[in-house]
Regions:
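Positively charged, small/polar-rich N-terminal and surface patches that mediate targeting and assembly
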Residues: 2-393
């Protein structure tokens, strides 16, 4: 549910927070992790993934033109939850620590959401994750860095093997951003197909793109078309808002032929224009609802459930019984191998996209399922999703 809905009719206790997501090359992950520990950030999750860029090289034997292929690089995706008034200070600290203002170092963004946490333990002790000290960044603003405001996150959850690489190629050809690809396991439509389920593999590729908000729907329509998402079982795509962020603009790897790279020029213009509106290209696609096959349902919600490893199935079943169409579950881990309660830090995160009309019912079902055990669910996060698409809609 949205912030307004939660305030008007809250079924359980909640708090408004910011989710900061940062993906960097795996060689930077240790340094960034140490800094997050120093900051005192709570609920930090790490997920392995890969970034995709274009590698351009001259053709051999002096032939004209260039050879272009995709280059994968290992990455770590950090997710931290902080108070909303601390979010930008933490982001600037992370940017300065990992030098994310330099092209090729990584991407960072924050999203505003409503968080439901599990209640206090039955023995009367408080939940340490709720009483953790506030984050205390030492840098309130990275020098020469201006966060972009007009951004959106596009999440594509794909069923077919190799489709993640295909959509990453499309995103790079469009010059949107550096795609980040992670893995997950799907539950929902496939389980209802009977014998036809063998045609839809359970493993999913999750492609995430941080793009200018002005072009988000136009890019979504192109991805739907290129990924054949109008066919059943191929996957789905949805959009969520980004409050602030900094995008990695190094889409291509190759020899630099000029005094400044195109990535440096784009970053400089973004700073001068104080946003990405000047990049808008898909003027006629954003509001095009004439093609019924590509109609984007409005007013949706993304529900994320973070739980102890092995417990996601119970929660997903409760969500499906409450009306959710399915879920995608990924394996993540806490920042340390043992969390502050002495439990193993392995976690599962299930992502569920639902219409706003049933969001409250699904959240209530999840909280009810988690009530039977103190350690089944760490928290539930609810985020607005202004546009979504799946074949079943």
């Amino acid at each position: 549910m949205s912030d307004t809905e939660a305030k008007r009719n809250p079924p359980h206790s909640y708090r408004e927070v910011s989710r900061i997501v940062c993906h960097v090359h795996h060689r930077l992950s240790r340094h960034l992790g140490e800094r997050l520990v120093e900051l005192g950030a709570r609920s930090v999750l790490i997920e392995p993934g890969r970034t995709v860029r274009q590698l351009r090289r001259p053709r051999p034997f002096g032939l004209p033109g260039k050879v272009v292929r995709l280059e994968d690089q290992p990455a770590e995706v950090f997710t931290a939850v902080v108070d909303r008034d601390e979010a930008e200070a933490v982001m600037h600290d992370i940017i300065a620590t990992a030098e994310l203002n330099l092209p090729g170092r990584g991407t960072i963004y924050s999203q505003g959401l409503v968080e439901y946490r599990r209640p206090a333990q039955r023995d009367g002790q408080s939940d340490p994750s709720q009483t953790a000290p506030p984050v205390s960044p030492t840098r309130t603003e990275a020098p020469g860095v201006a966060l972009l405001r007009d951004l959106a996150l596009i999440t594509c959850i794909l069923s077919m093997s190799g489709s993640g690489e295909q959509l990453a190629r499309v995103a790079l050809d469009l010059g949107t951003c550096v795609p980040v690809v992670t893995l997950g396991t799907g539950t929902g439509l496939r389980d209802r197909l009977g014998l036809l389920r063998i045609t839809v593999p359970p493993d999913k590729e999750i492609v995430q793109l941080v793009v200018p908000a002005y072009d988000a729907e136009g890019i979504m329509r192109i991805l739907i078309d290129e990924g054949n998402l109008t066919q059943p079982g191929r996957g789905f795509v949805y959009q969520t808002p980004v409050r602030a962020g900094m995008i990695d603009t190094r889409l291509r790897i190759g020899a630099q032929e000029h005094a400044a790279s195109i990535e440096q020029i784009i970053a400089a213009i973004d700073e001068l224009k104080a946003g990405t509106a000047w990049r808008k290209r898909f003027v006629g696609l954003a509001g095009d609802e004439t093609d019924e096959a590509l109609r984007l349902p409005r007013d949706n919600r993304e529900i994320s459930v973070i739980c102890t490893e092995g417990r996601a199935e119970t929660l997903v079943e409760a969500a499906i019984e409450a009306g959710a169409g399915g879920a995608t579950t990924s394996r993540v881990r806490r920042l340390s191998s043992i969390d502050i309660e002495g439990r193993i830090a392995a976690r599962e995160r299930s992502t569920i996209s639902v219409p706003a009309s049933i969001c409250e019912r699904v959240v209530s079902a999840l909280l009810e399922a988690a009530r039977d055990s103190d350690d089944i669910a760490d928290r539930i996060e609810v985020l607005d999703s202004p546009a979504a698409f799946t074949h079943t809609t």
